Regions:
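Extended effector regions of multi-domain proteins
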Residues: 22-46, 51-57, 72, 78, ...
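N-terminal short leaders/motifs
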Residues: 22-43, 114, 122-143
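Polysaccharide-binding surfaces and accessory modules of carbohydrate-active proteins
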Residues: 23-27, 101-129, 149, 186, ...
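Bacterial Sec-dependent N-terminal signal peptides
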Residues: 1-23
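Extended, loop-rich substrate-binding clefts of extracytoplasmic carbohydrate-active enzymes
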Residues: 45-68, 73-77, 125-184
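A broad, low-specificity signal marking well-ordered, structured residues that form hydrophobic/aromatic
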Residues: 19, 74, 83, 94, ...
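A short, polar/charged loop/turn motif at coil->beta-strand junctions and beta-hairpin connectors
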Residues: 2, 20-21, 70, 153-155, ...
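Acidic, contiguous internal or C-terminal segments within carbohydrate-active enzymes
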Residues: 77, 83-101, 161-212
């Protein structure tokens, strides 16, 4: 009987410790990355090339040789995953790792190579990018944004990134929150128009993941928008391709 009670005691404690999750943790540190930087701003007003994003200016020069630069990294971590955020690169989710395997499920690009892609010019691949305003990669996608970090009462942690969109005078915020007991993180976007004027803009996110032929996209909806704003069918397009399968995106 004593042996039975002892075994039950051990079993109950094993169940308790197995089901217990420590609080998520959040930290800041600097990491040296290889950088292909962009130039000083173009002194010619952007009114001559793209007046939709005035008063922003453009960056037109790009380095061919790399250098090293320290970037601030915000790390959110629980028992299951790590999430990395870069406030100096538009506040993007830089990458995410599943801890038991060490595999990335959000692509973390260790090389910051700016090239002429966004509305102001510089853009770099990888992670999850937040875009608000005019259709295109947001003007602040390659430059620092505001951020704060929080430890929440439920054991989760949050990093909130945000900025002002100058053409519309609107303000955007995105909270990246990591619960203590989930192998996933949440994003919660807020877009605030402090002006008395109604304005028609849009919000979109670009996410990067390591791509193989067996990659599939599980996302709701029955249509999508092209860069031009034209609506198309999802996931089966007009050519009969199932666009939710990466292997059928070979155009």
């Amino acid at each position: 009987m004593k042996m039975l009670r002892f075994l039950l005691y051990i079993l109950c404690n094993c169940i308790f410790f197995t089901g217990y999750s420590q609080n998520s943790i959040i930290s800041e540190y600097s990491k040296e990355l290889k950088l292909y930087n962009f130039s000083d701003p173009n002194p010619i007003p952007i009114l001559t090339s793209n007046n939709k994003i005035y008063p922003y200016f453009t960056f037109d020069g790009y380095e061919k040789k790399s250098s090293k630069k320290n970037f601030k990294i915000i790390k959110l971590e629980n028992d299951y995953i790590k999430v990395f955020i870069t406030p100096e690169l538009g506040g993007k989710v830089w990458g995410a790792i599943e801890k038991s395997t060490g595999e990335e499920f959000i692509y973390r690009n260790e090389v910051v190579k700016f090239r002429n892609i966004s509305m102001r010019g510089p853009w770099t691949s990888g992670g999850i990018e937040f875009n608000f305003g005019i259709i295109g990669h947001h003007p602040s996608t390659a430059t620092p944004v505001d951020y704060i970090i929080k430890e929440n009462s439920d054991g989760s942690v949050s990093c909130i990134v945000g900025n002002i969109d100058l053409p519309s005078r609107t303000q955007w915020r995105v909270e990246i929150m990591l619960p203590k007991d989930l192998s996933a993180f949440h994003t919660d976007a807020l877009w605030y128009n402090p002006t008395p004027l109604q304005q028609s803009y849009y919000n979109w996110m670009t996410g990067a993941a390591p791509a193989t032929d067996d990659l599939e996209f599980y996302t709701p909806g029955n249509s999508y928008l092209e860069h031009s704003g034209e609506e198309k069918k999802w996931p089966i397009n007009s050519e009969g391709r199932n666009l939710s399968k990466y292997s059928q995106n070979n155009f």
